[in-house]
Regions:
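Short beta-strand to alpha-helix junction loop
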Residues: 105-124, 265-269
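N-terminal Rossmann-like FAD-binding beta1-loop-alpha1 element of flavoenzymes
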Residues: 11-36
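Active-site-proximal substrate-binding core of FAD-dependent oxidoreductases
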Residues: 347-391
Length: 409
């Protein structure tokens, strides 16, 4: 059997999403500032950077402006600034448009963006900054020295459906790193290994998840207003946590999706069926008339909030983005928080490299800096959003409106 190669790197980011790519860019910026030779690698399981990002999101630019103040001048691929906001309360046969958009759903100054295009562009920015970015490198398991993470084993190639080597078998390399930063998205393979082994969720609330289902439709020319944003509550989710969204993108593309909390009480609840009913609603169906479905997908969404976030550091390890629960369910946004978490992880890694100290006592700076950041303030404000739905939609809106007032004071 072929030998397994070993590669050494200072900092290894796993998963080429907004968190890891922002972290890689920030770490290379700090290396240049301090005139240090810091090797940074990002690995991604998808065949291309951005493959796992389903198009369509409302991007809060706060974090990316901090990271790259000239991000738009560099050609960041946004579809459109948000041009209109609406909140619809849905019944089975009709809708009521809210007279005002609640503060937490106000998207003035935000951008409708394609996550797929944005991740690809950020990967290019990371490479230009000096990081190595590799697609088709799935992290299979963490490498350990007792309870310290020392690297990642990449998945083997050339194996059959039973996991047995074929004639073209090629063992995945072992990537050894002083610090491993996990940004795999929700319930990431390696993050689950680390959280379970090191009990990083001990003393935390259980993480609660939702499933977000999304489709991209090509609509007839002139029928989609780029930058339009609509969120919905009510039908067809009933008393279940969730709601819909419709984002207008450039080129008459329509991003339509539905979120359903996976803690639903009715065991017969079918999120995909609810999404089909949502699209058939008389307020939604006309938008899809003569349209063609281009892409579809679904992902888990960590909705547990601040008190369900695991401890995001250990010996040789940092956890970022959705893997660590950096998502604001109240605003239905996580990209900016993922970026900020990656930047905070990069700043922690830079300090650790400077001190040649990679144990958890040194990497605890990550959590300390998070608690001093605007990201913590935002997540603290939204800490009970999901639980608020237990009292019904109206009670939750009253809570979130009050919480949003706190955030904007």
């Amino acid at each position: 059997m072929a030998e397994r190669d070993q590669l050494e790197v200072d900092v290894l980011f796993v998963g080429a999403g907004p968190a890891s790519l922002a972290g890689a860019i920030r770490l290379r910026q700090l290396a240049e500032e301090h005139k240090r030779d810091v090797s940074v690698m990002v690995i991604e399981k998808g065949g291309e950077i951005g493959n796992h990002g389903i198009s369509g999101a409302v991007l809060d630019p706060r974090a990316i402006k901090e990271l790259l103040p000239d991000w738009l001048e560099r050609g960041a691929p946004v579809e459109s600034p948000v041009t209109s906001d609406a909140l619809w309360f849905m019944s089975e046969h009709g809708k009521i448009k809210a007279p005002i958009v609640p503060p937490m759903m106000n998207n003035s100054g935000k951008y409708v963006a394609s996550l797929q295009k944005l991740a690809k562009w950020m990967g290019e920015q990371a490479e230009a900054a000096g990081a190595d970015v590799f697609a088709s490198f799935p992290g299979q398991e963490l490498l350990w020295d007792d309870d310290r993470v020392i690297g990642v084993r990449v998945g083997d190639k050339g194996i059959d459906h039973e996991g047995k080597p074929k004639s073209n078998f090629e063992p995945g390399p072992d990537l050894l790193a002083k610090i491993v930063v996990l940004g795999e998205g929700p319930r990431g393979t390696l993050a689950k290994q680390a959280i379970a082994k090191l009990k990083l969720d001990e003393g935390k609330d259980p993480m609660v998840y939702a499933v977000g289902i999304k489709e991209i439709w090509q609509c007839p020319p002139g029928t989609v207003k780029a930058g339009s944003v609509i969120h919905t509550l009510g039908y067809p989710s009933g008393g279940t946590f969730g709601g819909g969204f419709i984002y207008g993108m450039a080129g008459d593309l329509l991003d339509i999706g539905f979120v359903v909390g996976l803690d639903y009480a009715d065991p017969t609840t079918d999120p995909h069926y609810l999404f089909q009913r949502f699209k058939a609603h008389p307020a939604i169906a006309p938008m899809l008339k003569d349209a063609k479905l281009l892409r579809y997908g679904a992902k888990a969404i960590p909705e547990g909030g601040l008190y369900a976030m695991p401890r995001p550091f250990a010996d040789g390890l940092l956890i970022t983005g959705d893997s660590a629960g950096f998502l604001n369910g109240m605003r239905l946004k996580g990209v900016h928080l993922a970026m900020k978490s990656g930047m905070l992880a990069a700043e922690t890694a830079s300090a650790a490299l400077g001190a040649d100290a990679y144990e958890e006592n040194g990497l605890a700076l990550y959590e300390e800096n998070f608690k001093r950041s605007w990201a913590f303030d935002e997540l603290h404000t939204a800490r009970n959003f999901h639980q608020g739905f237990d009292g019904g939609t109206i009670a939750c809106l009253l809570y979130t409106s009050d919480a949003a007032d706190d955030l904007t004071r």
